[in-house]
Amino acid sequence: MKASSDSASSGPRVWRNWAGTAKATPARWCRPPSEAEISAAVKDAASAGLRVRALGSGHSFTAAAATSGVALDLSQWTGITAADTRTGLVTVRSGTTLRALNAELGGLGLAMANLGDIDAQTLAGALSTGTHGTGARLGGLATQVEALELVLADGSVVSCSATSRPELFAAARIGLGALGVITTVTLRCVPSFMLLADERPMPVEEVLEQFDALAAANDHFEFYWFPYGRKALVKRNNRLSPSGSAGAAGAARALPGWRRFWEFEVMENAGFGALCRLGRASPRLIPTLNRFSSAALSARTYTDASYRVFVTPRRVRFAESEYAVPRESLGHVITELRRAVPRLADPVMFPVEVRVAAADDIWLSTAYGRESAYVAIHQYAGLPYRGYFDLFESVVAEVAGRPHWGKLHSLDVERLRPLYPRYDEFRRVRAEADPEARFGNSYLTRVLGQPVTERLRNARSPNRVRSAARSPG
């Protein structure tokens, strides 16, 4: 089967990511509505000598999705295909956005155990780049995956799980799109739950002193810090019992619609966006505006469905870099940023975000084998960020920081290899699954290199990734 004329088009259409930090001009665009057409598009690309990248929603800051070959737009490949409310196992098509998934799960009385703070990403894109939320006892989104189906470079479809092709599963849960096109994901979900959200400012020094205690005492803990300010906004989100009567929840209610609109849309987006535009027009004002934003932080407490607390609207555009560091190294990183940021030539408008995660066993996970703190730095769109991001990388390099795969960083193969104990095993599995780098691009070449095809030729079991592959349809 060839990709149908209804789902394929040619022409100089430009792809851009949300932040405006990456763009590309694919030779072909394809919107396959079925697994069979995804497979056909991959085969057609191979016949034409073109590379293939599956597009998400463009919320990676890197050029992870960029291609000059075939762009696979999976926006017609969406929805839940199977759900067992007893076990919580839910199978989802890969082009489904987290926003749509959360709504569908809610209708089934289910939820994701943990989420990041935006929901615009596709499920496959969020998994492939290592998207995470926060919680000292919880892992990133990929730790909620029970099984995957992928279309490999030859167009065959394979399934993998912890018991079936476990190496492919260990690699593909956070695979950067380098192993194949994820078509379905089976998630282990939990019963729907409510969160009690408590947000309040605290002096930065107190937050750092109490960091471990705060992380241990709360289901989901994070804080934001404006680099020139003295206060951080500490966010504690805790799960409620089904009755919703735990602790302070008796006095908390969901935010009324008008207040939610005022605080999230008007104040945190329109108002902050206006301050950012003022800072961009007159950079010398940025430290003052930053301190004003820090001083204006206020407290609020409310309850809502988990995904409505985890996720907040993001209308103000920015560039971002994020690194995972050992939990015990967080204080050093923040202290160095507090010391160095005021001396930067280009002032910083946006806050720093800090989150936590449990260790996991996913090969390219930034939390592989260690409890982690995530430090994310941002700069408003249109303001210079290179000096700030370079400074940040020099600080986190001192503590073996690992970069988020979907956020801006400068690391390459030689600098990444020592950070990931299973890095070379991932590259071996990639060489088996995609020996010609059909799913490659310039970003993957930088962070993974070219597949080592000689290993594939010399391997004792060269077909173990592809064995028992099935035809799509």
Language-model regions, residue ranges each:
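Noncatalytic alpha-helical scaffold of FAD-dependent oxidoreductases
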Residues: 1-473
